[in-house]
């Protein structure tokens, strides 16, 4: 079915729901990736090393499981829609607070709180979208939904490339602070969610049947323990997947600027081209997973990332690096594009808003030192150059993603109602 026809087949309510969930994940990622582009500028502002500022990435990732469990539990109890509204407003507020942080310590606290808010968006939004959309095109919309993360990265890259070189303010109006102020604008999405989006029909059906009884958070944890094998498998899978994405994204702008001496504009544009590849990969592989299966598509995309390493990390011209970035992110996010559908199909209905998001963010926690390990390895063995560390990350993690996926279960086409 052609791209446009898939959207035409949706009802107005389904289109509004998908748009809201996609935008929520997009703007969440936009706020997160602004930090990765501004690491050097923030280090200069706080008179510290870039490695110290990279701790902000760690604390953001480390606190995401807290948000996933907190907001996921709220979504099971109060509904997906109102929880997502609170979630979007919360991460926007903490992004704005980061812009006005006067010290490194307060900045790290703001990023940790941002991580709590960020942690809830994926699980709640994916549950709301995939419970609302028709099962026949679930793989396609899964790929498109997941690539909201990539679109957010693309927006951050373009904003950095276009605006950052022209910002020359100081103090509370330093260049990176202005970008973080812009990052607070996603709060406006809350109004759209409030007026245009309907609650998940699956959640409403459960409530009307008496299944959505008021529950304490501890009750949700007891329910999750009842599905411990699948929960542990998803944590392992998401640890590999988050190492795959963050290992190829978080320090890549720094690598381009510090190691290859690319300008801020070139860095932003190379990252933007990579994100266009990621968007294409996520949508294509998500759709292909309907035909070839979730597992097979993930394994294929992950392993094809390995041959892309030479062009991606060992080129020297901006054009070659952009081509490498496009191909690398096509494969990385191609594998990721299958994940929302894959995890929601594997997750039992009573914990669908909690389990995928919570396991995903626990995977983020377990891989949250990834960029620290990459930088430490580079400092100790390669005089600070990230080239070898980034290359090794892709080869090792791509193989692990393929192996774990191949050994796990699949539930393509499962009923989510």
Residue ranges of each PLM-predicted region?
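Extracytoplasmic gate region of multi-pass secondary transporters
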Residues: 36, 227-279, 367-371
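Glycine-rich segments within core transmembrane alpha-helices of 12-TM secondary carriers
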Residues: 139-164, 186, 357-371
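Central cavity-lining transmembrane alpha-helices of secondary-active solute carriers
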Residues: 58-72, 272-284
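Extracellular/periplasmic helix-loop-helix junction of adjacent transmembrane segments
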Residues: 36-66, 265
